[in-house]
Amino acid sequence: MSRRISRNSLVGVLLAALLAVLGSACSGSGRSVSQDCAKDGPTCRTSGSSASPSPDPSATVGEATSSPTASPSPTVKPAPAKTPAPTKKPPATAGTGGVSGAPVARTNCASPGDCGFPDADTTGPRITLKPKKTGYWAVRTDGLVIRGWDITGTLDIYANNVTVIDTKITSDSWWGVNLRPGYSGLKVLHSTITAVPGKGPDNGGVDYAVSNMGVSSVEVGWCDVSVFGDALSMGQGNLHDNYVHDIVPFINLGGEWQHTNTVISGGGNTGHLIIRHNTLLNPTSLKQGASGSIGLFADTGVVRNVTVDDNWIAGGAYALYGGDTGATGIRVTDNIFSTEYHPGSGGYGVVAHWNAGGAGNVWSNNRMSDGRLVKPEPSS
């Protein structure tokens, strides 16, 4: 009798041990074991981050060093990436171009972020920053990566393939970042670019957050941009997933209200300007120099080859200036024109100077924030 009891006890012990081993394979483990778990079994934990993926430079270099001409230090590790608020959608990251898929009907939203457009939670630096007072900095090192700094100053780029990433720039100069003619490859990514109102050289004002003085393309993506009068200024470039807001009006050195735009192009461009999946807000009043949210102006030549796609746009005298007579290759598609500042998105309406008969010009599926389709009036 005692041998039967002992044998049953041994079987029970072995069965309990077997169940414990099987249970540990598919639950409670700190490692990723999703490939070993049955569909109907316990939930398996997988690793991953909700932060947006970085372009290649951030994966291969560390913090920028204290010397402007030195190589970035590989020994300083960045702080963990910040995670967007759970109620917000992560930024679009289909490659470094930020190309988003076919837009969903996104109207009647309380804010751009609620409709999946960039806001403060999905733009700007993702790491802890180190204060750095550079003042005016003429960057002359090809391939330099500036990362992890909270810069007080301005960057004037006389070099190729410079990347500014996970950085904040507070400028008191004409611009935050400027690319000089003859140079190429500038990228400004996951950064905040702002200024102190009243401290700039234009009678206290500041003009350009990112300026492209050359003929090469500049990429600006996932950036939080504010204060500057003509925030993103270029004829060619790739502007995607940015949050441009809180432009501050000022009277310039000429004694006039500075005309303000979140994006401005003066025409005569040789390349392609892409403006895709941004939040572009110009709250400047009509009495204080409001021009456009997006201003495509034929100031220095014909406007050509511009894509304005899947943006949240609001403010300005007109929300969009479309290039005027002679403009070609202008594609305006799938944008939301918000009424948050004016019933017509801009103070006088949605669009002016649209050249409907221009070769390659397309206006398609653009809506007000309440869902109404927008059709441009003929250019006078």
Which functions belong to the PLM regions below?
Residues G116-A120, P125, V206-S217:
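Short, basic/low-complexity N-terminal boundary segments at the transition from targeting/disordered tails
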Residues G143-D150, N161-S171, Y183-G198, G214-V227, ...:
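Right-handed parallel beta-helix
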Residues A102, T107-S111, G116-I127, T284, ...:
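Long, ordered, amphipathic alpha-helical scaffolds
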Residues C26-P125:
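N-terminal low-complexity, Pro/Thr-rich disordered segments
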Residues K130-T134, I151-G153, S171-R180, A195-N212, ...:
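Extracellular beta-strand/beta-solenoid scaffold signature
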Residues G95-K168:
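N-terminal segments that cap or nucleate solenoid repeat domains
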Residues S2-G30:
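Secretory targeting and sorting signals
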